[in-house]
Amino acid sequence: MSAPNARTTNWAGNVTFGSPRVHRPRTLDELRRVVRDSPRIRALGSGHSFNLVADSDADLVRLDGLPAEAEIDPEGRTVTVTAGTRYAELVTALHGRGFALANLASLPHISVAGSCATGTHGSGDGQRCLSAAVRAVQLLGPDGDLGWLSRDADPEVLPGAVVALGALGVVTRLSLEIEPAFTMTQRVRVGVALDEVADHVDDVFGAAYSVSLFTDWLGEGSVWLKQRTDRPEGAWRGGRPASGPVHPVPGMPPEPSTEQMGVVGPWHERLPHFRPELEPSAGRELQSEFYVPREAAGAAFTALRGIGHLLAPALYVAEVRTVRADDLWLSPAHGRDCVTFHFTWLPDPRAVAPVLAAVEERLLPLGARPHWGKLTAMDPADITARYERAADFERLTHALDPGGKFRNAFTDALFPRG
């Protein structure tokens, strides 16, 4: 099934995709025919990217029309899901069987395949990005053939095929690591001085299983502490406890936020910031994010504090999180623990552009890598130069997609072919 004359936009509305041909197959065989017959095609996720990573000038395909499946292997501790499944659907199925994922992103509304393709993450000193949970991927190749790559059978290749920006084929299924379900609490501390966080990064971000700092970079922020009930809490207690539930964006009603105030609840109702049944975040917005090496966190705090007067007027809110290193070739956390600096901008590209340039001027010399699905003004060659395995990934694209069916202008700029 296709919509030949409909222009598709992303969730934020800042991107209108270039192709009017958007396919939404209902069966795997239909998807295979669409891919086989298309000259160039890109798969769309849930539309929560803010750039042209998923765009195409030929064909687009949505996978959310395929039957959602979640096949749990209790002994192997994996769940195999169809690519268009959203985390909100997956976590309910897992929890009902007594299992969990190690971590979740801020939004449960996002698709599993799209999140893994771009290196989406949550927070936690011991937690890797969501993509690092992938044990195997099923890829639909340019000729419509299906094949699996796995950690066990293809240990040298799979790390290059997970955070792959859709450039290797259409991911149809993924197998993810799971663990026994657990319970958590969520507490928020407000009035936290940014200088205190900068001086005690390890204490603050080690205070709970998952920790986020929200701020406008003018002097104070709120720290969200998401703690497993089966793990000891850290000692840090800066600021003061919030007097009631809050939203990450100051002044917005707290109802979309997951339950706080230390109430014990299941993992999937505490790890995200937002409830799946309500509108996430601020609505219309722009986003950027940069992964800075953990050892440069203090310098990054100092640099951003120095331009707080520029940042605050352009922001809904900024968020700081931590991510553990992984081995995925194009993961922004490849080979190094990171502190991530996220910016939820007002939906005004002209106002945001000079402020984003000021952020990059300060963070890029610290070794920052941008999020693949968010806004950056970086030169594509500068981005790929920050990845030690970029050349290996380019060779993998040649091997799996020699004709370039799954490429687009975004990947062509990053990995040009002669």
Q: Model-derived features: where do they sit?
A:
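C-terminal substrate-binding/cap subdomain adjacent to the FAD-binding core in PCMH-type
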Residues: 135-314, 322
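Structural signature of FAD isoalloxazine-binding scaffolds in flavoprotein oxidoreductases
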Residues: 51-71, 122-144, 170-177, 339
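Glycine-rich N-terminal segment of FAD-binding domains in flavoprotein oxidoreductases
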Residues: 13-109, 119-124, 213, 320
